[in-house]
Design a protein with these regions (language model features):
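Short alpha-helical transmembrane segments in multi-pass integral membrane proteins
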Residues: 1-25, 82-147, 191-247, 303-370, ...
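N-terminal transmembrane alpha-helices
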Residues: 12-44, 48-49, 62-77, 81, ...
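Transmembrane helical elements of multi-pass membrane transporters/channels
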Residues: 23-42, 143, 154, 177, ...
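Helix-terminus/linker motif at the lipid-water interface of multi-pass membrane proteins
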Residues: 33, 37-55, 124-131, 187-196, ...
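Small-residue hotspots at the loop-to-helix junctions and early N-terminal turns
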Residues: 51-62, 137, 141, 200, ...
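Small-residue-rich hydrophobic transmembrane alpha-helices
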Residues: 54-114, 151-170, 277-339, 374-397
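Hydrophobic transmembrane alpha-helices of multi-pass small-molecule transporters
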Residues: 66-69, 181-185, 211-215, 287-290, ...
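Short runs within selected transmembrane alpha-helices of multi-pass transporters and secretion channels
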Residues: 75, 143-162, 170-178, 199-212, ...
C-alpha cells in the first residue's frame, strides 16, 4: 500500500509473527511514551511550582480522560474495521470507512469540548476541590479541554495508518508534538509565570501543530486511504458498524475513567499530598506498562487483518506470542521497579515534598510488583478488539473498576483499616482478577464467533 511502503504487505498475513508484532509494537511504544511525556512534562514543571497546582491537574485529568476515552471508541472501531477491510482486500470500503470515522470523531470532539468548557465550574465543585486547588483546576480544564479536536485528529491519523501496519508515521508525528511541548512548558509556566494556565496552553499548542500536519497528510490523494469529499456523506450501514464496534469501547473506556475520577475523590480524602502521590505513581507506572499497551494495540491489528483474511488460527497464534512477550517483559521490569531505592529515586524527580515522595514510592512499589497481569489484560483485550468483540472488553473494563476495585477498596478501608494503602492494593487486586477473567473468556472461544462482516464479499 502506498501509505505503508516501508513494510512488507504480507508480513502481518503471511510473514514471521514475532517480527510483525515487534515491527508494529516498537513504534507504538515510542509513540505512547511520547504521549505520556506530555503529562509528565507538566507534572515535572508543576512540581517545581507547588503541590496545589500538581494536585489540581491530577484531580481533573480523569474527567478529561472520560470524554477522550468515549470519543476514542470511534477511532478504535476505525482501526479494527479498516484493518478487516484491508485483510479482506476491500480497499475502497477501507477508504470510505476512514472518512466516516473522521466525520464522527471530529463532530463529537467539538461538541464535547464546548459542553465541558461551559460546565467547568460545576465539574470542579463536584470533585470536591476548594481553595487554591479548585481555582487551578478550573483554569487548567477550561484551556486544555480545547485540545480534544486536535487529539482526535491525531488519533484518526494513527488509526488509519496502524490499520495498514504503519505505526512509524504516527510515532514521528507525536515526536514533533512532544519536542514542541518540552520547550513550551517552561516558557509559559516559568518564564511567563503562567502556572497551570501555561501548562494547559503549552499542551494545547503542542497538539494543534501535529494535528494540522495529520490533516494535511490524510488529505493527500496519492494515499490509498485518504480523506476525500466523495466519501464525506454519512452512510447508515457504516455508521451502524462504527457504533456496533465502537460504542462498547466508548462506554467501557469512559465508564472506567469515571471510576478513576471517583477513585481520585477517595484519594483526595487523605489530603493534597496523597492526591499528588497518586498522580505521580500512576504516571510512572504507566511508563513501565507502555510496551504492554503497545503490544495489545499490535495484537488488535494482527488479529483484525487475519480475521478479515479468514485466518483465525494465525490470529490466535499472534495473540499467544504477544501475550508471552508482554508478560515476561512486565515481570522483569516490575521486579526492578518494585525496589524501594529505585522507586524513591524515580518519584523524587517529580516532587521534592518528602511526604509526597514517600507515598508515591510506596504506591509505585506495590503496583510494579503485580504489573505483569497487565500483559495478560492488554493483549487479550487486543484479541477481542481485533475480532470486533468489544462488548467483552467493555464488560471487563466496567467490572474491573466498579465491582472489583471499589469492593476491594471498601474491604481494605473499612475492614482492614489500611488507610491510603487501601487504594494501592485495590488497584493491583482488581487488575489481577480482571486479567484472569479475560483469559478464561479467551479459552472459552468467544472471540471466534463472527460479530462483524466487512466488505462486499461479506454482503
Amino acid at each position: 500500500m502506498k501509505t505503508a511502503k516501508k513494510y512488507n504487505p504480507d508480513l502481518i498475513l503471511h510473514g514471521n509473527l514475532i517480527r510483525a508484532i515487534l515491527s508494529l509494537a516498537i513504534p507504538v511504544v515510542i509513540n505512547s511514551f511520547l504521549q505520556t511525556m506530555y503529562n509528565l512534562t507538566d507534572t515535572y514543571w508543576l512540581g517545581k511550582i507547588g503541590t496545589e497546582q500538581l494536585a489540581a491537574i491530577n484531580l481533573v485529568t480523569p474527567m478529561q480522560n472520560i470524554i477522550t476515552n468515549f470519543g476514542s471508541g470511534i477511532t478504535v472501531a476505525g482501526a479494527v474495521l479498516i484493518a478487516q477491510y484491508i485483510g479482506a482486500g476491500e480497499k475502497e470500503e477501507a477508504r470510505s470507512m476512514a472518512n466516516q470515522i473522521f466525520i464522527c470523531a471530529m463532530g463529537f470532539a467539538v461538541v464535547c469540548a464546548a459542553l465541558c468548557f461551559l460546565g467547568t465550574p460545576a465539574i470542579v465543585n463536584w470533585l470536591g476541590a476548594d481553595g487554591g486547588t479548585a481555582y487551578y483546576a478550573r483554569v487548567y480544564l477550561r484551556v486544555v479541554i480545547w485540545d480534544m479536536p486536535f487529539l482526535y485528529m491525531v488519533n484518526i491519523f494513527s488509526a488509519v495508518h496502524q490499520a495498514q501496519g504503519d505505526t512509524v508515521r504516527p510515532m514521528f508525528l507525536n515526536l514533533g508534538g512532544i519536542t514542541l511541548n518540552l520547550f513550551l512548558d517552561p516558557f509559559f509556566m516559568i518564564i511567563l509565570d503562567m502556572g497551570t494556565a501555561g501548562a494547559a496552553l503549552a499542551t494545547l499548542l503542542a497538539k494543534a501543530v501535529p494535528a494540522t500536519v495529520a490533516f494535511i497528510l490524510l488529505c493527500r490523494p496519492e494515499n490509498d486511504i485518504c480523506l476525500n469529499r466523495r466519501y464525506m456523506q454519512l452512510q447508515r450501514e457504516k455508521l451502524g458498524m462504527i457504533l456496533k464496534v465502537g460504542l462498547p469501547t466508548a462506554i467501557g473506556g469512559s465508564t472506567m475513567q469515571l471510576g478513576f475520577l471517583l477513585m481520585s475523590k477517595n484519594v483526595f480524602v487523605y489530603g493534597t499530598e496523597a492526591m499528588a502521590a497518586y498522580g505521580i505513581g500512576n504516571k510512572v507506572n504507566g511508563l513501565i506498562t507502555l510496551p504492554s499497551n503497545a503490544i495489545g494495540s499490535a495484537t488488535a491489528t494482527i488479529v483484525g487483518q487475519n480475521m478479515g483474511a479468514k485466518q483465525p488460527e494465525r490470529a490466535e497464534q499472534g495473540y499467544r506470542f504477544s501475550m508471552w512477550i508482554s508478560v515476561v517483559f512486565l515481570f522483569i521490569g516490575g521486579m526492578i521497579l518494585s525496589r524501594d531505592m529505585i522507586s524513591t529515586a524515580i518519584v523524587s524527580i517529580f516532587s521534592k515534598d518528602a511526604e509526597v515522595v514517600g507515598m508515591a514510592a510506596d504506591f509505585l512499589s506495590v503496583m510494579a510488583l503485580w504489573c505483569f497481569t497487565n500483559g495478560v489484560y492488554n493483549t487479550t483485550s487486543g484479541l477481542f478488539q481485533g475480532t470486533g468483540h468489544t462488548e467483552v472488553t467493555m464488560a471487563i473494563d466496567v467490572t474491573r473498576l466498579w465491582v472489583f476495585r471499589f469492593l476491594t477498596l471498601w474491604f481494605c478501608e473499612s475492614i482492614l483499616h489500611m488507610g491510603v494503602r487501601s487504594v494501592w492494593y485495590s488497584v493491583v487486586i482488581s487488575n489481577g482478577i480482571s486479567s484472569l477473567i479475560l483469559y478464561v473468556l479467551y479459552r472459552c472461544g468467544i472471540w471466534k464467533k463472527t460479530r462483524i462482516k466487512v466488505g462486499k464479499k461479506a454482503a
